[in-house]
């Protein structure tokens, strides 16, 4: 069994109104991770993802750049114990 990890990610900068959520969901699905992404009221984007260590790490690295129209100023990552309760990667509203 692959080494599974879970991360809570908060991205700040110009990350709303630039297709960040859709792009993150597409990237998460491409990488085969489970989880979700949503906008926060304060202008940041939050995601919670779980999967193989390499895939989750790749998504965290992707968040540092985001889609072309985004300007990422910061990425906060909190590593938590995997729970196995996340479904297919989705956008939450």
Curated annotation (Swiss-Prot):
EC number: 3.6.1.7
Keywords: Hydrolase
Domain Acylphosphatase-like: 6-93
Residues annotated as the enzyme's active site: 21, 39
Transmembrane regions: none
Catalytic activity: an acyl phosphate + H2O = a carboxylate + phosphate + H(+)
Any Pfam family the entry gives: Acylphosphatase
InterPro entries linked: Acylphosphatase, Acylphosphatase-like_dom, Acylphosphatase-like_dom_sf, Acylphosphatase_CS
Record flagged with keyword Nucleotide-binding: no
GO MF annotations, alphabetized: acylphosphatase activity
Similarity comment: family membership: Belongs to the acylphosphatase family.
PANTHER family associated with the record: ACYLPHOSPHATASE
Protein name, entry field: Acylphosphatase
Gene: acyP
């Amino acid at each position: 069994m692959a080494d599974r990890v879970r991360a809570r990610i908060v991205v700040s900068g110009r990350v709303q109104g630039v297709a960040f959520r859709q792009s993150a969901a597409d990237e998460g699905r491409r990488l085969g991770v489970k989880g979700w992404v949503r906008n926060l009221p304060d202008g940041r984007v939050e995601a919670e993802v779980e999967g193989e260590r390499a895939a989750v790490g790749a998504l965290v690295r992707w968040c540092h750049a985001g889609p072309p129209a985004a300007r990422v100023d910061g990425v906060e990552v909190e590593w938590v114990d995997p729970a196995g309760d996340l479904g297919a990667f989705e956008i939450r509203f």
